[in-house]
Design a protein with these regions (language model features):
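N-terminal export leaders
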Residues: 3-7
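Short, structured coil segments at secondary-structure junctions
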Residues: 110, 179-180, 265
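A short, structured surface patch at a secondary-structure boundary
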Residues: 55-61, 65-153, 159-165
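Bacterial Sec-exported substrate-binding components of ABC uptake systems
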Residues: 2, 20-102, 213-240
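Sec-dependent N-terminal signal peptides
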Residues: 8-14
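Extracytoplasmic substrate-binding proteins
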Residues: 93, 137, 150, 154-248, ...
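Flexible, glycine-rich surface segments
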Residues: 231-313
């Protein structure tokens, strides 16, 4: 069976890097801002952006807030709603805590925008990030639950990019904001599929004034996937898992993006009937016996070492 349903037909405007869409169904102008157009997105639903005259962009992330990106040298905007956080470019001293974002910054050639990391050098799976930290171009400033506030302030941090884990420690977010550091909680993990997650590249393109590069990189990645989706499904079954310290098996729920990538690549995710209690739950824990009964005949076993570490046998 063809898997074209994973790949929407991109509108012609998007294929020609039309970051400035033609949709003129305008929301009400905000204070002195004059609405121009809504930024076109093809897959992502967990953020939106409205573009205003003068290069101002309002980013809206559900349950995470609204952010007005102000171009370098542009005038301040009067009478903004209280919930809007102003991000003035250049955003070149970023404290990056959300590890999934690092690869997107690499693709935007924007590592020099990151001054601080929430992960130590040895913890990075992105080689460019590890090297930058080893060379002292990016400094460690503590994990999401225990940031080094002194170092963050000394570095002149312009933005902290967190994932939703910080919501379990709301006092951290509050303290950063109290010190004048704006906090953006990214929600790419709540997207419905891999291409939607990847489209967050465009959000960082907006923040870093690299929208054309972000759109071009995204277009190229979509094209790379397109021919794969045209191929017939191989029928090979795949189990993707890790083992916790208390000997439980962690697997991805059926609708998770990893399971979707298996299907996009032509495989069959073996746990095709597992869903979490909430839509935000991406993993499910199984007893060893249950996992073995389902996975023993799988054609491919993929062990996820990024969470629990590399598995050792004795």
């Amino acid at each position: 069976m063809k898997r074209r349903n994973f790949l929407k037909a991109l509108p012609a405007a998007a294929l020609t890097l039309a970051g400035c869409g033609q949709n003129k169904t305008a929301p009400a102008n905000t204070a002195s801002l004059v609405f121009d157009h809504s930024y076109p997105l093809d897959y992502a639903t967990q953020f939106s952006a409205d573009c205003y005259e003068g290069g101002y962009v309002m980013i809206d992330i559900p349950d995470a807030g609204r952010f007005l990106v102000v171009p370098e040298g542009a005038a301040e905007v009067d009478d903004l709603p209280e919930d809007v956080v102003v991000l003035r470019q250049p955003l070149d001293h970023i404290y990056l805590v959300s590890t999934s974002v690092m690869d997107l910054f690499v693709h935007l050639d924007a590592l020099d925008s990151i001054a601080l990391s929430g992960t130590k050098a040895e913890g990075w799976y992105v080689e460019e990030a590890r090297q930058a930290m080893q060379e002292g171009r990016i400094a460690y400033a503590g994990k999401y639950s225990a940031p080094d506030y002194e170092r963050i302030l000394a570095a002149g941090c312009t933005l902290a990019i967190e994932n939703t884990m910080v919501l379990h420690d709301p006092e951290v977010k509050e303290q950063l904001e109290k010190f004048g550091v704006p906090v953006l909680v990214e929600r790419s993990s709540y997207e419905s599929g891999p291409l939607a997650r990847m489209e967050w590249l465009k959000l960082y393109g907006i923040l870093l004034n690299k929208t054309e590069m972000a759109e071009e990189v995204f277009r190229q990645k979509v094209e790379q996937v397109a021919h794969i989706l045209e191929q017939e499904n191989t029928g090979k079954t795949v189990a993707f898992f890790s083992i916790t310290t208390n000997n439980l098996i962690t697997v991805r729920r059926t609708s998770d993006y990893v399971a979707q990538m298996v299907e996009m690549a032509g495989g069959v995710y073996i746990f095709d009937d597992l869903e979490g209690e909430t839509s935000a739950q991406s993993t499910i824990k199984l007893p060893l016996e249950t996992f073995y009964a389902r996975a023993r005949d799988a054609d491919v076993l993929i062990y996820n070492s990024t969470i629990e570490g590399v598995m050792e046998t004795r």
